[in-house]
UniProtKB/Swiss-Prot annotation:
It is found in: Plastid, Chloroplast thylakoid membrane. This is Cytochrome f. Component of the cytochrome b6-f complex, which mediates electron transfer between photosystem II (PSII) and photosystem I (PSI), cyclic electron flow around PSI, and state transitions. Keywords: Chloroplast, Electron transport, Heme, Iron, Membrane, Metal-binding, Photosynthesis, Plastid, Signal, Thylakoid, Transmembrane, Transmembrane helix, Transport. GO terms for biological process: photosynthesis. The lineage of its organism: Eukaryota, Viridiplantae, Streptophyta, Embryophyta, Tracheophyta. Binds 1 heme group covalently. GO terms for cellular component: chloroplast thylakoid membrane. Its cofactor is heme. InterPro entries: Cyt-f_TM, Cyt_f, Cyt_f_lg_dom, Cyt_f_lg_dom_sf, Rudment_hybrid_motif. The gene is petA. Pfam families: Apocytochr_F_C, Apocytochr_F_N. Belongs to the cytochrome f family.
Length: 320
């Protein structure tokens, strides 16, 4: 009986341990996958600074292109596509957090005019849903529905991201007007070089924090290096820690200068930003334009008919 109770207790403990381990794994995976937008969302009230710079550039230091395509004009209460393209060489591999190589992720932030927001699912057409795929967009803040973020997502599949946008209706939103509005976009591919707290990631170059002789290089068991730099004048030693990922450029016995690169720069990604303009068009203005064009066409037709009638009269008089 005691043996059976002990076995039952051991079984419960093993099951509990497995459940806890699984929960920790899931939570860890979730925090890593959603880290990039969270860095900006937690650190900045607005992703676009007064200078026009998007804050993602503070962590992604390399400058890369990004493209945005939107309609020239849209009508009120209409769903349209904002297509963001983040081009890069699909053959490239980036340094992951563990020092290994892997594919690049991409992410984007779309800053829309006030009143514009993510289209509700029931307003999105099947064709647009197919373009969107399995992407899940979120607002930058609960009170900033006009600012949307996405990522990180696999760059191999989503280097082109389609945002479904709903235009506002000035009839129901009095602070919205029929005007031309700017749209801003930022897009990154790959991991950043600096974390929000100012510390470096392993996806950047590491420089010497002192001048002297490289007296010792220790390769760490889990990857990375400990580099001891000895000052030739007073013997003072400084140890620089290199995380797994960057390739070492110096060797023992080498004389180095302050701020000299100790490693290569493994970064193959970067961040870019751009802008576009969109007109919120008044339907009455469109109707007026169509009426004007129709009247011009009718006037041209009547003019041609009148001219032909006049020519017939002239021809009849000449024959008479």
């Amino acid at each position: 009986m005691q043996t059976r109770n002990a076995f039952s207790w051991l079984k419960k403990q093993i099951t509990r341990s497995i459940s806890v381990s699984l929960m920790i794994y899931i939570l860890t995976r979730t925090s890593i996958s959603s880290a990039y937008p969270i860095f900006a969302q937690q650190g900045y009230e607005n992703p676009r600074e007064a200078t026009g710079r998007i804050v993602c550039a503070n962590c992604h230091l390399a400058n890369k292109p990004v493209e945005i395509e939107v309609p020239q004009a849209v009508l009120p209460d209409t769903v349209f596509e904002a297509v963001v393209r983040i081009p890069y060489d699909m053959q490239l591999k980036q340094v992951l957090a563990n020092g290994k190589r892997g594919g690049l992720n991409v992410g984007a932030v779309l800053i829309l005019p006030e009143g514009f927001e993510l289209a509700p699912p029931d307003r999105i057409s099947p064709e647009m849903k197919e373009k969107i795929g399995n992407l899940s967009f979120q607002s930058y803040r609960p009170n900033k529905k006009n600012i949307l973020v996405i990522g990180p997502v696999p760059g191999q599949k989503y280097s082109e991201i389609t945002f479904p946008i709903l235009s506002p209706d000035p009839a129901t939103k009095k602070d919205v007007h029929f005007l031309k509005y700017p749209i801003y976009v930022g897009g990154n591919r790959g991991r950043g070089q600096i974390y929000p707290d100012g510390s470096k990631s392993n996806n950047t170059v590491y420089n010497a924090t002192a001048a002297g002789i490289v007296s010792k290089i220790i390769r760490k068991e889990k990857g990375g290096y400990e580099i001891t730099i000895t000052d030739a004048s007073d013997g003072r030693q400084v140890v620089d820690i290199i995380p797994p990922g960057p390739e070492l450029l110096v060797s023992e016995g080498e004389s180095i200068k302050f701020d000299q690169p100790l490693t290569s720069n493994p970064n193959v990604g970067g961040f870019g930003q751009g802008d576009a303009e969109i007109v919120l068009q008044d339907p009455l203005r469109v109707q007026g334009l169509l009426f004007f064009l129709a009247s011009v066409i009718l006037a041209q037709i009547f003019l041609v008919l009148k001219k032909k009638q006049f020519e017939k009269v002239q021809l009849a008089e000449m024959n008479f």
